[in-house]
Regions:
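Sequence/structural segment immediately N-terminal to covalent heme-attachment motifs in c-type
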Residues: 1-24, 42
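Extracytoplasmic electron-transfer domains, predominantly the class I c-type cytochrome c fold
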Residues: 22-80
Length: 115
């Protein structure tokens, strides 16, 4: 992430904006995509990253680099899935029951997706 992504998306994944409009999107945190978005699935995110990132240099990362970046990115908190049922476990079972989803997993002592 530091080598290939931070220049545009920020060291803390906050993205960059100009005049109040996003230029490079936040990859995690309150202004990023929510847990229900396709990029919240590591396989989807890795495929997009491999084909399109870094900007203008799509296809230059190895498969492993794309998966590593996607896993790192999806290991951070983001806005709640709009389909949230009131229970992280139930929401994971219904909408994120995949080894490629970090939703509901514990990372650094915090359950991702917990209110």
């Amino acid at each position: 992430y530091t080598q290939h992504c931070a220049l545009c998306h920020g060291a803390d994944g906050q993205g960059q904006s100009s005049g109040g409009k996003p230029v490079f999107p936040a990859l995690w945190g309150a202004r990023s995509f929510n847990w229900g978005a396709g990029m919240g699935d590591i396989r989807n995110a890795a495929g997009f990253i491999k084909a399109n990132m870094p900007l203008g240099l799509g296809g230059t990362l190895t498969d492993q680099e794309a998966w590593d970046v996607a896993t790192f990115m999806d290991s951070h908190e983001r806005p709640q899935d709009p389909r949230f049922t009131g229970s992280v476990q139930d929401t994971r079972a219904k909408f994120h029951d995949s080894p490629d989803s970090m939703y509901g997993r514990s990372v650094n002592g915090r359950v991702l997706g917990a209110p």
